[in-house]
């Protein structure tokens, strides 16, 4: 069973069970295998090279799709009433305008927020935790650093963030795919 788990985690999807069993039997009984260890190693190297190329092609296709989807989404948002497009590509809509202090790029802020992917799935929310987040504006994604500086305490904005102002080409493993444009609703509670 351990061998099967190791094979699966290595990405091996297809196995000729007859050949596998014959090779296993030959090794365990001391018989001469049909394929030498050197040939088996070369076959595995070839298999893994093909698997890696396939995975790379899939990742490139997914990345291209994410970029196109993000560009289309942002182009549509840019046409909506009330949406402001900044030179950086960051877009926002004022939901509520506050009248308190505005932060600088190096200030710490207390915010409530909710982040979603373009398909609407939520990947993070301080509202769900029922606890505002505190962070330095120089310690977050560039879209947040730029966008939150536009807000006054008491404001609530919706940001539409292109991938290059979010998590970029790498994404955030397990939560945000590479090249993902994001939507954030941010409520600036306090500049600290």
Whereabouts are the PLM-identified features?
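Cross-family detector of peptidyl-prolyl cis-trans isomerase
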Residues: 1-192
């Amino acid at each position: 069973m351990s061998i099967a788990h190791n094979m699966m985690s290595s990405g091996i999807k297809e196995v000729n069970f007859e050949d596998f069993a014959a090779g296993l039997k030959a090794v365990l009984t001391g018989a001469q295998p049909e394929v030498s260890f050197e040939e088996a190693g070369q076959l595995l190297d070839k298999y893994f090279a093909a698997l890696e190329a396939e995975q790379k092609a899939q990742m490139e296709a997914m990345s291209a799709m994410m970029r196109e989807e993000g560009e289309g989404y942002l182009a549509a948002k840019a046409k909506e009433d009330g949406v402001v497009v900044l030179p950086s590509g960051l877009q926002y809509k004022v939901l509520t305008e506050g009248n308190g202090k505005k932060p600088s790029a190096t200030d710490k802020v207390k915010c409530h927020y909710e982040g979603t992917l373009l398909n609407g799935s939520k990947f993070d929310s301080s509202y769900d935790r029922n606890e505002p987040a505190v962070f330095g504006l120089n310690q977050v994604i560039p879209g947040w650093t730029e966008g939150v500086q536009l807000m006054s305490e008491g404001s609530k904005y919706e940001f539409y963030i292109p991938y290059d102002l979010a998590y970029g080409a790498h994404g955030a493993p397990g939560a945000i795919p590479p090249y993902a444009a994001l939507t954030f609703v941010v409520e600036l509670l306090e500049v600290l």
